[in-house]
Amino acid sequence: MDYLPIFADLKQRPVLVVGGGEVAARKVDLLLRAGAEIRIVAQSLSPILEQLSQQGQIHWLGQAFAAEQLDEVFLVIAATDDSALNAEVFSEADKRRVLANVVDDQPRCSFIFPSIIDRSPLVVAVSSSGQAPVLARMLREKLEALLPASLGQMAEVAGRWRGQVKQRLNAIGERRRFWEKTFGGRFATLVANGQTAEAQRQLEQDLEQFAQGSEGTQGEIALVGAGPGDVGLLTLRGLQVMQQADVVLYDHLVSDEILDLVRRDAERICVGKRAGAHSVIQEETNRLLVELAQQGKRVVRLKGGDPFIFGRGGEELQVAAAAGIPFQVVPGVTAAAGATAYAGIPLTHRDHAQSVTFITGHCRPDGDGLDWADLARARQTLAIYMGTMKAADISQRLIAHGRAATTPVAVISRGTRADQLVQTGTLQQLEQLAQQAPLPALLVIGEVVELHHQIAWFGHQPQAEGVSRPAVVNLA
């Protein structure tokens, strides 16, 4: 270990900063957040530092560094572009046993700054001992994605309850088990969702049960949108919830790459729906959700796209609510937004479409109830989910209600994935395009489809209108 990682209390402690530029300003910002009393020496101050000086947040000692300025300071930072001055600062600090940091000059550092993930009061520091700062920064960025912003508030609440928990639970091991269950249970979810008062009540209830010898954990359901396929489109919140799951119920549309991000010891159950017997399968999914949550498990219902857009997520949460099970929803990038963006087809455009309508081709048995005359209006975009089997009926109805047979259309298969296929043509060719489209596929109808030939950017791109490569088929 080249450096001992410690956390220093700088509140109201004098710290000297030599330098007045942007680098010095960044260090000053960090020191202010730690509550330090900042003294600064510089020929001139950057606008930010000058403002801080005028506000009395820092004390500008003068333009020239003098060794006696180090007397009684806790540490010093040299952040100038004068290497000789930086060396002098370090030398004088070393003589006085004052901790010193010369920016970007590791040999002249008795301490170094780590990369910081700030979830105050929870703080994570990452360091490569100055050997690979870019690597440390990259690791910090990965940790930033994994650590919810609510951790700080969670730690604050826990800090306020430490005394009461210690009074109620005498044994150290007992307290440890309590906090492990608390931080991994309903309390954490409530804090993350901004329900602080409810979180306090939950913690009080959990403590009472624990003190009475009942360590039962309340189960919950998280409805999570996995996005259209590309793992990079999964939200940070979705990733965090998935990595806390005990059980994951997922659909066929969820990619293997996204499933690989689920907590490794979580149980995975595929509840994907195929054509036929949908009500029975959905009822079984509803039963599993309730049953598993009632066992005290954190259940993630992982759905492709967004769970509230043609995903029957609302129906599943109605069942959870009726059973009295807590739940939360994590939205996802819906297929119509993701697939069209990756195909270079804007859903709206000032010159072509002032509105967009999402439709499902998989309707209830008693009919679709759609206003086809309204859907046939020009200058709008239709995005149709699960519509390949009804493509012929869709095109016939739209044409019959006045939409031009030459209206541009696209069928996007496996949108946002590496093997994405985009087929384009006209409304009268929609059935032919849909018949040869791999599933899952999205139908897009409207003049905006023409822009695909100009701004397609992902995967194989069309060379010109009427000319195609393997991943782009044009029947127009």
Curated annotation (Swiss-Prot):
Residues 1-203 are annotated as: Precorrin-2 dehydrogenase /sirohydrochlorin ferrochelatase. Then it catalyzes the NAD-dependent ring dehydrogenation of precorrin-2 to yield sirohydrochlorin. Finally, it catalyzes the ferrochelation of sirohydrochlorin to yield siroheme. It catalyses: uroporphyrinogen III + 2 S-adenosyl-L-methionine = precorrin-2 + 2 S-adenosyl-L-homocysteine + H(+); precorrin-2 + NAD(+) = sirohydrochlorin + NADH + 2 H(+); siroheme + 2 H(+) = sirohydrochlorin + Fe(2+). The keyword Ion transport does not apply. Pfam families: CysG_dimeriser, NAD_binding_7, Sirohm_synth_M, TP_methylase. Keywords: Cobalamin biosynthesis, Lyase, Methyltransferase, Multifunctional enzyme, NAD, Oxidoreductase, Phosphoprotein, Porphyrin biosynthesis, S-adenosyl-L-methionine, Transferase. It comes from Serratia proteamaculans (strain 568). Its EC number is 2.1.1.107, 1.3.1.76, 4.99.1.4. NAD(+) binds at E22, V23, Q43, S44. The modification Phosphoserine is found at S128. GO terms for molecular function: NAD binding; precorrin-2 dehydrogenase activity; sirohydrochlorin ferrochelatase activity; uroporphyrin-III C-methyltransferase activity. The active site is at D251, K273. Transmembrane segments: none annotated. Pathway: Cofactor biosynthesis; adenosylcobalamin biosynthesis; precorrin-2 from uroporphyrinogen III: step 1/1; Cofactor biosynthesis; adenosylcobalamin biosynthesis; sirohydrochlorin from precorrin-2: step 1/1; Porphyrin-containing compound metabolism; siroheme biosynthesis; precorrin-2 from uroporphyrinogen III: step 1/1; Porphyrin-containing compound metabolism; siroheme biosynthesis; siroheme from sirohydrochlorin: step 1/1. S-adenosyl-L-methionine binds at P228, G304, G305, D306, I309, T334, A335, M386, G415. GO terms for biological process: cobalamin biosynthetic process; methylation; siroheme biosynthetic process. Coiled coil: none annotated. This is Siroheme synthase 1. In the N-terminal section; belongs to the precorrin-2 dehydrogenase / sirohydrochlorin ferrochelatase family. The lineage of its organism: Bacteria, Pseudomonadati, Pseudomonadota, Gammaproteobacteria, Enterobacterales. It comes from the Bacteria. Residues 219-476 are annotated as: Uroporphyrinogen-III C-methyltransferase.
